């Protein structure tokens, strides 16, 4: 595996010794692919692997950020990328009653279904559970002098809202309090 890939030069701008800068689009894709499988790329780079990897991650994040800015509305961007919160009773889906699915606005991953939604009276869409494939990330949040648990899309890192322990007890007691701006209804 390593021998095959180490003989595959993908850089468009190698130095005199054939080492890659790690900055071309194909380099970045390759570096991130190796990182995703938990390996170092066997290609020799001009900079140390850690620096090349960090550059690739930063470049990818910058590209994604620009894509999000162009595709999302201001409130969608502020909520999902900057962990903002929309005002209660203002979001598009807080009172949604139709049957369907709720997807991450950034990546389209299925997060919730209408069967999981209930009226908590809080002014944000509330769900007692997440879809079995959602794998929503839960992160301790001590901002604003409070203790909460933030929920994020584990696929694209979009801020969704918070989870609380005041949901329906017969459904597990959880309340996913989700910003309408972070989801799409289909």
Tell where the protein language model's regions lie, with residue ranges:
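Nucleotide-activated chemistry modules centered on ATP-dependent adenylation/adenylyltransferase
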Residues: 1-59, 67
């Amino acid at each position: 595996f390593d021998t095959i890939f180490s003989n595959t030069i993908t850089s468009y701008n190698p130095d005199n010794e054939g080492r890659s800068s790690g900055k071309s689009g194909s380099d970045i894709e390759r570096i991130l692919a190796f990182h995703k499988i938990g390996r170092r790329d066997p290609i020799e780079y001009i900079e140390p692997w850690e620096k090349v990897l960090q550059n690739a991650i930063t470049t990818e994040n910058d590209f994604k950020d620009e894509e999000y800015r162009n595709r999302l509305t201001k409130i969608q961007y502020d909520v999902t990328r900057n962990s903002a919160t929309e005002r209660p009773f203002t979001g598009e889906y807080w009172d949604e009653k139709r049957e369907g699915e709720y997807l991450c606005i950034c990546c389209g991953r299925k997060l919730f279904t209408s069967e999981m939604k209930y009226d908590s009276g809080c002014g944000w869409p509330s769900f007692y559970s997440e879809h079995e494939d959602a794998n929503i990330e839960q992160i301790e949040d001590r901002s604003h002098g409070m203790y909460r648990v933030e929920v994020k899309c584990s696929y694209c890192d979009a801020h969704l809202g918070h989870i609380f322990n005041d949901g329906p007890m017969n459904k597990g007691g959880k309340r996913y309090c989700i910003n309408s701006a972070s989801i799409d209804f289909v």
